[in-house]
Amino acid sequence: MLRHSSTPAHVVARDLSVDYVTEEGEREAIPGTLRYDPADPFAVELILRPGEEAITWIFARALLAEGIEVPAGTGDVRIRPTRSKGQTVITVSLSSPSGHADLELAKSKVTAFLADCHGQVPAGRESNGIDWNNELHMLLRTRNT
């Protein structure tokens, strides 16, 4: 994880209800949080709390931003705008060796979250505060141990 060295940590977090869409098309509401830490400027977290333990998925902030407008992603995380119950929602499709899940998030909540994120670190400026010499040093140190 690349660390943004000069940005004060103003973490953005937005709680929201996430609809898990079953294979039968039924929806189950799960408490969730979208989280962005400017110290890790390229990533966002989707934290799901279906029970006692939280499940966290980390993926690119740019992927989320693209996915609210057009289908985005080709790997374990795919994001696209869709219609559900007469409104536009953001569908996040997650795949792992243990299974697959389609989740629906309110587009208005995701859009507001991204606006707050871009207020902390504007799109295209994620790497401006990264100490690249330190990152290289850490990579080389890790490789040599």
From Swiss-Prot:
* InterPro entries linked: SsgB, SsgB_sf
BP terms from Gene Ontology: division septum assembly; sporulation resulting in formation of a cellular spore
Q: Which GO terms describe its cellular component?
A: cell septum
Q: Which UniProt key words apply to this protein?
A: Cell cycle, Cell division, Septation, Sporulation
Where does it reside? Cell septum
Q: What is its main location?
A: other
Similarity comment: family membership: Belongs to the SsgA family.
Stated role: Involved in sporulation-specific cell division.
The protein, known as: Sporulation-specific cell division protein Francci3_3418
Lineage of producing organism: Bacteria, Bacillati, Actinomycetota, Actinomycetes, Frankiales
